[in-house]
């Protein structure tokens, strides 16, 4: 149903009480609740401060890796490809959605930097008269101006020093209050390998942004182009994934609405049936009151079972919807607000997340129905010596209670029909006593998983279903039996298919000489021969087994399966005994 969530032992940093995901838009950390500081983008597309992530309790699982880099998180722009043997993989849990995050080799600081969040923080700070912004040079004083040439925020002292230097004398300086109308004021994104160079190009071969020094160095022979020239192709691929993800949000919302309606219907039916039960039980005084209490308890059990099932499905769909919304909202924000370079930097994480979300399977229909009814005329046995009437009927099949029956359930022969019985039961373990349930059977060869065997399911109309299939080849097969898309007891199970039973084409004789009437050219599979040019076996002669056997394969048991494989091992004269 939903994305894999890994339980974590020990303390894990969680959201503070009353905190919701995505608090304060895109500028505040969901953990510390303050403006983002060095925000890192997780594979689930949630953003958290670097220091907050470092404070989370990590866990480790054994991970086998070859010569590939970590793919769970993009990390920084550059990652070395180093072969790694069996080693523990360090991970954390996302403090927003509890998704497992496998950390790259560089740890938290190797996760992708969320440049969109940094830009939003800058804009948020400007709206608050620059409060919270510190000088990019001295990191000590509050910002007063911004150098539009260097794209750096400067305090008054550094601004004066900036103007006194010959190289920066003529740089354009702007007051912070004059930048409030800007939508993009982020810092230039510099190359990790060459900090003096800005990332302006994109390597198609390595699928990552590069600088000018990278192009003439490590990526000299690689196809590279400016980010503005390649953004259309890569942006279109992300938009295509987004178009495939958006319909899931509507489908999940509709499914949750159906669950809510079904839950209300269940509650209404419970109330109605309870009223019927109370009305019917008034005439029988103590006996009926006792019977009534039993019926109400049974009804409550049914309600709890149905409600728990609906609540579980609701929780799973809500979590999946939250994940889908996060993916859609972040991607839409990225495509509408992000720069070309920001889209390219974040593209890998977004594509991986949306691809994973698009592969998640879920049911858009409630897992249970509101079918609960009361039959007042149905006999319910004796209660305190009185014959009472009235029973609750749900008769909803419970896959966990359904069983498989058959003598040769795990054995079959090639090209011969095999069969077994599926007995459907309800939640109380009683036979359904009727047909109409959706029984699905799949028979798959273990060595040819893409070639399932054709199966037939016959409804006997009494709660049992006759399943038959004919395996074409010997080997091991896996049989999956599902009711309401859930496995029944004993499913899946394996079936060993042996070769088809082969009858003997020869004769069961004491020796070739006797069975052939003394023919010299008659042979026997036992390998015995006789002097005088006889090709077959004879009593007391060389190679004779000393007991009756089959002429075709040499087996001693008269009632057995022939093992003669044909071809060179069985000349034509070997079977002449049959004709004679």
Curated annotation (Swiss-Prot):
Keyword presence, Lyase: no
Positions annotated to bind Zn(2+) 2: 191, 194, 214, 219
InterPro entries: Bbox_C, Filamin/ABP280_repeat-like, Filamin/ABP280_rpt, Ig-like_fold, Ig_E-set, TRIM45/56/19-like, Znf-RING_euk, Znf_B-box
Filamin repeats: 394-497
Top-rank lineage group of the source organism: Eukaryota
Annotated compartments: Cytoplasm; Nucleus
EC category: transferase
E.C. code: 2.3.2.27
Coiled coil: 281-335
Pfam family, one: Filamin
Molecular functions (GO terms): ubiquitin protein ligase activity; zinc ion binding
Zinc finger map (RING-type): 29-98
Chief location: cytoplasm
Entry GO terms, CC: cytoplasm; nucleoplasm
Binding site for Zn(2+) 1: 135, 138, 158, 162
Chain ranges of zinc fingers (B box-type): 130-176, 186-227
Reactions catalysed, as given in the entry: S-ubiquitinyl-[E2 ubiquitin-conjugating enzyme]-L-cysteine + [acceptor protein]-L-lysine = [E2 ubiquitin-conjugating enzyme]-L-cysteine + N(6)-ubiquitinyl-[acceptor protein]-L-lysine
Keywords: Coiled coil, Cytoplasm, Metal-binding, Nucleus, Repeat, Transferase, Ubl conjugation pathway, Zinc, Zinc-finger
Family: Belongs to the TRIM/RBCC family.
Function (record text): E3 ubiquitin-protein ligase that plays a role in the regulation of inflammatory response. Mechanistically, mediates the 'Lys-48'-linked polyubiquitination of TAB2, a regulatory protein of the kinase TAK1, leading to its degradation via the proteasomal pathway and inhibition of the TLR-mediated inflammatory immune response. May act as a transcriptional repressor in mitogen-activated protein kinase signaling pathway.
The protein's name in its UniProt record: E3 ubiquitin-protein ligase TRIM45
């Amino acid at each position: 149903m939903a994305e894999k969530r890994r339980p974590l032992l020990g303390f894990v940093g969680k959201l503070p009480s009353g905190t919701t995901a995505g608090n304060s838009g895109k500028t505040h950390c969901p953990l510390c609740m303050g403006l983002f500081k060095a925000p890192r983008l997780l594979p689930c597309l949630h953003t958290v401060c670097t220091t907050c992530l470092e404070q989370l309790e990590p866990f480790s699982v054994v991970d086998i890796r070859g010569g590939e880099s970590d793919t769970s998180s993009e990390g920084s722009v550059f990652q070395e490809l180093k072969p790694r043997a069996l080693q523990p993989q360090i991970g954390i849990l996302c403090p927003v959605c509890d998704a497992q995050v496998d950390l790259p080799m560089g740890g938290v600081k190797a996760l992708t930097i969320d440049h969109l969040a940094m830009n939003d923080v800058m804009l948020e700070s400007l709206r608050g008269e620059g409060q919270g912004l510190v000088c990019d040079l001295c990191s000590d004083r509050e910002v007063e101006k911004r150098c539009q040439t260097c794209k750096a925020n400067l305090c008054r002292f550094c601004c004066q020093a900036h103007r006194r230097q010959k190289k920066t004398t003529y740089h354009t300086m702007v007051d912070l209050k004059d930048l409030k109308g800007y939508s993009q004021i982020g810092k230039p994104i510099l190359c990790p390998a060459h900090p003096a160079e800005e990332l302006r190009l994109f390597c198609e071969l390595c699928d990552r942004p590069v600088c000018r020094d990278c192009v003439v160095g490590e990526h000299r022979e690689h196809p590279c182009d400016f980010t503005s020239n390649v953004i259309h192709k890569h942006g279109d691929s992300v938009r295509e994934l987004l178009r495939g993800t958006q319909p899931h949000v509507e489908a999940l919302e509709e499914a949750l609405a159906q669950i809510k309606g079904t839950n209300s219907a269940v509650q209404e039916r419970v109330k109605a049936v309870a009223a019927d039960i109370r009305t019917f039980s008034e005439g029988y005084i103590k006996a009926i009151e006792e019977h009534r209490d039993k019926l109400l308890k049974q009804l409550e059990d049914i309600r709890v079972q149905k409600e728990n099932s609906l609540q579980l499905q609701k929780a799973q769909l809500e979590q999946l919807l939250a994940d889908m919304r996060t993916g859609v909202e972040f991607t839409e924000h990225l495509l509408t607000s992000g720069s070309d370079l920001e889209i390219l930097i974040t593209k890998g994480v977004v594509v991986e997340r949306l691809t994973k979300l698009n592969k998640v399977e879920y049911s858009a229909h409630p897992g249970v129905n509101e079918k609960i009814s009361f039959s007042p005329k149905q006999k319910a046995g004796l209660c305190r010596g009185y014959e009472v009437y009235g029973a609750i009927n749900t008769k909803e099949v419970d896959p966990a209670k359904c069983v498989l029956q058959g003598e040769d359930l795990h054995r079959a022969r090639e090209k011969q029909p095999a069969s077994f019985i599926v007995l459907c039961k309800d939640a109380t373990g009683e036979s359904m006593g009727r047909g109409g349930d959706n029984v699905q059977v799949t028979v798959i060869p273990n060595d040819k998983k893409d070639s399932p065997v054709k199966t037939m399911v016959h409804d006997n109309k009494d709660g049992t279903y006759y399943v038959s299939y004919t395996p074409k080849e010997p080997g091991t097969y896996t049989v999956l039996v599902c009711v309401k898309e859930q496995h029944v007891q004993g499913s899946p199970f394996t079936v060993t298919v042996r070769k088809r039973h082969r009858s003997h084409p020869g004769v069961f004789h004491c020796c070739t000489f006797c069975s052939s009437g003394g023919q010299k050219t008659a042979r026997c599979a036992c390998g015995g021969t006789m002097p005088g040019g006889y090709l077959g076996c004879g009593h007391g002669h060389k190679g004779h087994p000393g007991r009756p056997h089959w002429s075709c394969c040499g087996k001693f048991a008269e009632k057995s399966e022939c093992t003669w494989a044909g071809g060179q091992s069985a000349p034509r004269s070997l079977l002449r005994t049959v004709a004679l």
